[in-house]
Curated annotation (Swiss-Prot):
Gene3D superfamilies: Ribosomal protein L11, C-terminal domain, Ribosomal protein L11/L12, N-terminal domain. Forms part of the ribosomal stalk which helps the ribosome interact with GTP-bound translation factors. The keyword Ribonucleoprotein applies. Belongs to the universal ribosomal protein uL11 family. Part of the ribosomal stalk of the 50S ribosomal subunit. Interacts with L10 and the large rRNA to form the base of the stalk. L10 forms an elongated spine to which L12 dimers bind in a sequential fashion forming a multimeric L10(L12)X complex. It comes from the Bacteria. This is Large ribosomal subunit protein uL11. It comes from Clavibacter michiganensis subsp. michiganensis (strain NCPPB 382). PANTHER family: 60S RIBOSOMAL PROTEIN L12, LARGE RIBOSOMAL SUBUNIT PROTEIN UL11M. One of its GO terms (molecular function) is structural constituent of ribosome. It holds the Pfam family Ribosomal_L11.
Length: 143
């Protein structure tokens, strides 16, 4: 077994799928850890090509020899909720001004998609988390 590489940094970014480029915020974040920025951009764009239009969070682990590995996460719940509700952004005052409505089926669908990244044991608990996020954005969840 090869000796373990020493980790020197962990970078978390949220980048549009298939649209990573060396411009800020990606360039400076990777540059200060000595990562080859173009190499990361090409690899990220290749892996996220199928999900164009979504924002995909990525966790980049940088090693001592300046190599890196990255893990793609599921899109943020807020992004999925906005897409399902068909709104550009949540409400500025969520408890007084409601901007859209979601059905429980839509919430369950988002919960299934996010299940891997959520701290929930079953789909019902995940749906409750998603419903809470929707409410905090000024989106009504109908039972």
């Amino acid at each position: 077994m090869a000796p373990k590489k020493k980790v020197t940094g962990l970078i978390k970014l949220q980048i549009k799928a298939g649209a990573a480029n060396p411009a800020p915020p990606i360039g400076p974040a990777l540059g200060q850890h000595g990562v080859n920025i173009m190499e990361f951009c090409k690899a990220y764009n290749a892996q996220t090509e199928a999900q164009r239009g979504n924002v995909i969070p990525v966790e980049i682990t940088v090693y001592e020899d300046r190599t890196f590995t990255f893990i793609l996460k599921t899109p943020p719940a807020a992004e999925l909720i906005k897409k399902a509700a068909g709104v550009a952004k949540g409400s500025g005052t969520p408890h007084t001004v409601k901007v859209a409505k979601l059905t429980m089926d839509q919430v369950r669908e988002i919960a299934e998609q996010k299940q891997a990244d959520l701290n929930a044991n079953d789909i019902d608990a995940a749906a409750k988390i998603i419903a809470g996020t929707a409410r905090s954005m000024g989106i009504t969840v109908e039972a």
